[in-house]
């Protein structure tokens, strides 16, 4: 093979390798875009009751219900749960009374928390859920 053809072939290989690396980098960056940085209580403008509810949510609910996405979780996302007319999966009205019942008694695979949370803690949790 002529030296000039070898040089052209190497340049093409380098360009293809560069294009492949660029594509892999872009895909990697886009995949990371779904991950949201956790905002502080102050950034979210939470009041003391909502902050207490957020702590309860983090300890008990976040395992199955992501606040902003359902990816990789068993339960539905809680984002905008009170902006919907009906609760996801159950179809019950989305209001404080119904959500309180679900928190206390559980539903489907979700355990009830009537023996774990008192009424004030449930109210705190509801206050936080209203912010999502």
Region spans (language model):
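The canonical Cys-X-X-Cys-His
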Residues: 53, 57-67, 125-129
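Extracytoplasmic electron-transfer domains, predominantly the class I c-type cytochrome c fold
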Residues: 73, 80-132
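Cys/His-rich metal-chelating microdomains
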Residues: 36, 67-68
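Short, low-complexity, charge-dense intrinsically disordered segments
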Residues: 1-27
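C-terminal motif of bacterial Sec signal peptides marking the signal peptidase cleavage site
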Residues: 29-32
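Residues at secondary-structure transition points
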Residues: 44, 48-51, 69, 73, ...
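Electrostatic cytochrome c docking/interface patches
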Residues: 34-56
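Soluble periplasmic/extracytoplasmic beta-strand elements of cell-envelope proteins
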Residues: 63, 77-80
């Amino acid at each position: 093979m002529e030296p000039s053809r070898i040089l052209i072939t190497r340049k093409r290989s380098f360009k293809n390798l560069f294009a492949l690396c660029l594509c892999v980098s872009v895909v990697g960056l886009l995949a990371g875009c779904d991950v949201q940085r956790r905002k502080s209580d102050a950034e979210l403008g939470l009041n003391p009751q909502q902050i207490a509810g957020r702590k309860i949510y983090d300890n008990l609910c976040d395992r199955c219900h992501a606040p902003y996405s359902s990816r990789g979780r068993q339960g539905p996302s809680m984002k905008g749960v009170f902006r919907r007319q009906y609760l996801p999966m159950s179809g019950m009205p989305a209001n404080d009374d119904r959500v309180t019942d679900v928190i206390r008694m559980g539903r489907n695979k979700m355990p009830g928390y009537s023996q774990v949370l008192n009424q004030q803690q449930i109210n705190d949790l509801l206050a936080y859920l209203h912010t999502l």
